[in-house]
């Protein structure tokens, strides 16, 4: 029974370690044997071990050569037995390296770093965001979580994890407990309602594992904004509201053409500007401020407070004198 347990324990070792142990035993054994068979040619056990290493690796320097039939027979036996194990050893290492690389591309390798950004969902917005993050923080590692991709994008400083973002196992493989920030994008393959439900569920899973993570979540419908706030979102991006304002701005530009506007192409890439609160808007509701600036061909996307930016605040929010408008 004891020998059986030892054999089972031996089989549990990784294959390349077992082969390496066998090769080491062969080298030590034949180094001792050749020293005993030809003491004149091999004056020490170390010289025998050196000869065994050179022989088993099929290098064959020729500095030590057995002269007796017994020594030559030992050399033949070592080549036949040892060379096969050495070949199997390096083949196993190569296969293990290839397998790990393949598992890395498929998103099956866990991330071990810390202070990273977790980006959930793969779409054109995410692709653009990754490029912008590389420009803004080139040394920051981004862990991409997505279930639809079979292979991760080969982008520098991007570690791909394949799996459902709301699953604890997937988040743990992304090392969520050590993450600095989490960005959750809406699932493009679901309806708006289902996508928002999944985003809130993912947010709950993230906050449950790392309450200190700074979470930015994309919400498509207004009715899920409150749920996202309750789930602990630090910032909520209302895509529908942002797009509607931008389209309205484009429409107003069309209605009010001017010589300076001819030939100008407006995009969503405009730089965000900070605007002071006009005297007539101090204490006014955020909705009133939005309409005021729309009349002046300016789109407001949020409020810059002393504590930090607040994107898409409630329409009933009262603007303070110390606030600033985030405008594009």
Curated annotation (Swiss-Prot):
* UniProt-recorded Gene Ontology molecular function terms: potassium channel activity
Q: How does it sit in the membrane?
A: Multi-pass membrane protein
Q: Where in the cell is it found?
A: Cell membrane
Q: Could you list the residue ranges that cross the membrane?
A: 19-39, 42-62, 73-93
PROSITE patterns, per database record: RCK_N (PS51201)
Ranges for domain RCK N-terminal: 114-238
Q: List, alphabetically, the GO terms of the cellular component aspect.
A: plasma membrane
Q: Name the chain's protein.
A: Putative potassium channel protein YugO
Gene from which the chain derives: yugO
């Amino acid at each position: 029974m004891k020998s059986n347990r030892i054999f089972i324990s031996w089989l549990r070792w990784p294959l390349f370690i077992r082969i390496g142990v066998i090769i080491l035993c062969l080298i030590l054994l034949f180094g001792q044997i050749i020293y005993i068979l030809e003491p004149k040619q091999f004056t020490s056990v170390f010289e025998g071990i050196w000869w065994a290493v050179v022989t088993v690796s099929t290098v064959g320097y020729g500095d030590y050569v057995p002269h007796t039939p017994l020594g030559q027979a030992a050399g033949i036996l070592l080549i036949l037995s040892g060379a096969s194990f050495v070949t199997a050893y390096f083949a196993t290492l190569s296969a293990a390296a290839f397998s790990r690389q393949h598992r890395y591309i498929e998103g099956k390798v866990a991330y071990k770093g810390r202070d990273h950004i977790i980006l959930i969902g793969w779409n054109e917005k995410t692709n653009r965001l990754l490029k912008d993050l590389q420009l803004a923080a080139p040394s920051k590692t981004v862990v991409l979580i997505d279930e639809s991709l079979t292979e991760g994008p080969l982008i520098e400083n991007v570690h791909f994890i394949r799996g459902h973002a709301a699953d604890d196992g997937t988040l743990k493989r992304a090392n969520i407990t050590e993450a600095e920030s989490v960005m959750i994008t809406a699932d493009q393959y679901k309806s708006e309602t289902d996508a928002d439900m999944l985003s809130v569920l993912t947010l709950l899973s993230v906050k449950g594992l790392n309450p200190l993570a700074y979470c930015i979540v994309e919400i498509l419908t207004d009715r899920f904004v409150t749920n996202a706030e309750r789930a602990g979102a630090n910032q909520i991006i209302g895509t529908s509201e942002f797009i509607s304002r931008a389209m309205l701005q484009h429409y107003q530009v069309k209605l009010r053409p001017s010589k300076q506007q001819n030939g100008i192409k407006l995009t969503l890439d405009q730089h965000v500007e900070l605007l002071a609160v006009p005297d007539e808007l101090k204490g006014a509701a955020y909705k009133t401020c939005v309409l005021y600036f729309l009349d002046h061909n300016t789109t407001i996307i949020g409020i810059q407070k002393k504590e930090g930016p607040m994107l898409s605040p409630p329409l009933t929010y009262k603007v303070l004198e110390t606030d600033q408008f985030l405008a594009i």
